[in-house]
Amino acid sequence: MFHRRFMVDMNMYKKMHPAQNENALEKASHNRGKHSHVDSSIGEIDVDMTQDDPPSDDEFLMCLPSTVKGFDMKNKEWRLLEVAFIQRVEWNDKAFEDLVIEPRTKSLIKAVVTNRVRSEEGADVIEGKGNGLFILLHGGPGTGKTLTAESVAEIAKRPLYKVTCGDLGTKAHDVEKYLETVSLLGKTWGCVVLLDEADVFLEQRSLANLERNALVSVFLRVLEYYDGILILTTNRVGTFDEAFKSRIQLNLRYTNLDRDQRLQIWTNFVKRLEEMEVSSQQISGSYGINAAEIRASLSALAGENLNGREIRNILSTARQLSSYEEKPLG
């Protein structure tokens, strides 16, 4: 079953929606006026009471109303959630294990991320300055950059906040406002922030494009004071802006996949399809998978010059065709 991830933080919701909070307070005050004989403190819990003996998850959920606001980490919007269906996130450590990149690169990423999570202290001790971990992943499409960022969030056991340039807008003022919100949420919730396709922020500034220069300056200013984990990905890097070089702790280039890597990706996807099939056997519309037949073709398939995204899309299309024709995938 697919589980979407939400951050339940009523304090942050109230900060971001002050008008709604004021309306709720006015309504509560009006109701108390109608029932003045009722002690307004009834139902309130002193925070200190829960420090020494924190309630279990089930006990805590019983104290909540039937619905609460939660921030959808995928769509980046607040949604009304039914408390009865809320459960803790199950982190997928296997995602990083299955990541198909150079072993040394994988070890390096895991080392710096693990050390960052273990320690909240950074090398820059200037008051007010950020002590963030900034990682740049650059290379062609479908080479594993975005998947690396998603896997890092899993091993760090932190929510992933994914931002694309389309989210940011094109005006410096809008970009700054959006990035400040991302920075606030990222710091408060301990997120791994992914800025996907960050080309516009990384290339060297020039006199020929003042509008883009303003965007780069805004990004650098926000970056200066961010103290979380930030991963930037780009398909191309021409000339780095000099201001970024001292801020990026880990700069990794992703090359096109070789045959062995493509074979491993095919193998991982087939294994995942088998696992999905086991969990969905009771679901109508599932017609099975002929894994042995597919595996017999993997060597030939790995010889095709495809990237990871193309391999995923091929298998996704094959599953849809299998369902449409009502026969096993293979």
Task: Describe the residue ranges of each PLM region.
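AAA+ P-loop ATPase mechanoenzymes
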Residues: 1-122, 132, 169, 242
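Intrinsically disordered, low-complexity sequence elements enriched in Ser/Thr/Gly/Pro
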Residues: 2-3, 30, 234, 260, ...
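Generic detector of ordered secondary-structure context
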Residues: 65, 100-104, 211, 310, ...
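Walker A/P-loop NTP-binding motif of AAA+ ATPase domains
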Residues: 95, 99-295
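Conserved AAA+ ATPase small/helical "lid" subdomain
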Residues: 252, 273-330
